Regions:
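Active-site-proximal alpha-helical scaffold in enzymes
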Residues: 32-40, 45-81, 119-141
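Stable alpha-helical structural segments in soluble proteins, enriched in small hydrophobic residues
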Residues: 59, 172-180, 207, 211
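Solvent-exposed alpha-helices and their adjacent loops that cap or buttress functional pockets
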Residues: 16-17, 29, 40-43, 67-69, ...
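A glycine- and small-aliphatic-rich helix-loop capping segment at beta-alpha/alpha-beta transitions
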Residues: 1-16, 66-69, 89-102, 164-168, ...
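Conserved small-residue
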Residues: 36, 56, 63, 92, ...
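Condensing-enzyme catalytic core mediating Claisen C-C bond formation in acyl metabolism
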Residues: 103-180, 189
Length: 227
């Protein structure tokens, strides 16, 4: 792995570096997108979005915008995470973001629970095919869902802590609703960030209540991190 190769370099530095010739190509974030384009011969926009936990959602919005701007008819978009490593676990543990409920790992990650104390590290990946509506209809494609809008923002607050009032999350949802030309009352489900941390979950709830008002109590809400 990249981490092992870097670690090996510093461990054996006195004997000289032994880098694999593919070290740099494997290191860059957009190599995953590059592999997809090379395998399938795709010549459209090709890059990786790097925005921490929002990367996959941002890639979805980027794909949506490229299609509605006429830059492409079909785009493969998605994301992956493989952070279970010494550096990944050590770093998140130092931030006190990981649950210490080791005796009950199956239910340790419990977003919005009063007894939450952090998340459980996991890995995974997913890709979606986004296609211009008329293009999909013309070829008789099975359409699973329609993307109607997206929003982006930032807390502009702290390196690791979310804004205590959830300002960034509030702006994101407002921007998404505006872009989709939807009213808050038309939303019935939110898949939240839900880190299961004492600070993060509170700010997210505040943001939802601020945007949706009384309708917030009618929403179905869940976090993938609880699964």
């Amino acid at each position: 792995t990249f981490e092992e190769e870097v670690g090996g370099y510093f461990t054996n530095i006195e004997r000289g570096p032994k880098f694999n010739p593919f070290f740099i190509p494997k290191m860059i974030a957009d190599i995953a997108a590059g592999h997809i384009s090379m395998i399938y011969g795709f010549h459209g926009p090709n890059y990786a979005t790097v925005s921490a936990c929002a990367s996959s959602t941002h890639s979805l919005i980027d794909a949506f915008n490229n299609i509605r701007l006429g830059k492409a008819d079909v785009i493969v978009t998605g994301g992956a995470e493989a952070a279970i490593s010494v550096a990944g676990i050590g770093g998140f543990n130092a931030m006190h973001a990981i649950s210490t409920r080791n005796e009950d790992p199956q239910t340790a990650s419990r977003p919005f629970s009063a007894s939450r104390d952090g998340f459980v590290m996991g890995e995974g990946g997913v890709c979606l095919i986004l296609e211009e509506l008329n293009h999909a209809l013309a070829r008789g494609a099975k359409i699973y869902a329609e993307v109607v809008g997206g929003g982006m923002s930032a807390d502009a607050y702290h390196l690791t802590a979310t804004h205590p009032e959830g300002l960034g999350a509030k702006l994101v949802m407002q921007n998404a609703l505006s872009d989709a030309e939807m009213k808050p009352e038309e939303v019935d489900y939110i898949n939240v960030h839900g880190t299961s941390t004492p600070v993060g979950d509170i700010s997210e709830v505040k943001a939802i209540k601020s945007v949706f008002g009384d309708h917030a109590y009618e929403l179905n809400i869940s976090s993938t991190k609880s699964m």
